[in-house]
């Protein structure tokens, strides 16, 4: 790992739950229904695979959420968790750090980064079946359970999104994934899509990916 935060954002823990009624193996991504899937897994005794066991899978289903909505929701969740667990912290300072340093927590880490971490454990030939999160309620009906988290309001979203340098690039990275909903691609094919179809825009990002890959990927 490059730094201590890499072990938080790219943990050695990737989990996939089987949804046999839907012929899906769904990757657990925070703020993309992971709590609902964990509840279903525990309630119904569904199969849960992690890490090296993912090598046996021919495909994994990944639900991609609207990037801006997920970012706002994720930061909101992160800050409320901080307030709950560390009430001594100043909330304005916590907000500043969350906005200034972009991605300090997995709740709002770009979905592209979640796939990057998943790729460490998948077979090179495994297909990633990209799905629109708007269809998530077809496999889990309780995903609106907020687990005690109060929803953000328009003022919070505006304060978070305004003058947030560099954020749009990463939101666009996730939007490209969402635009691929319905496709089945290997990780290599996804990377090639980024680095060929969007060459000019993502030249810097592709170089960044290579640096991460050397330090994070096997």
Annotate each PLM feature.
Residues 1-67:
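PAPS-dependent sulfotransferase catalytic core
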Residues 13-17, 47-64, 68-216:
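PAPS-dependent sulfotransferase catalytic domain
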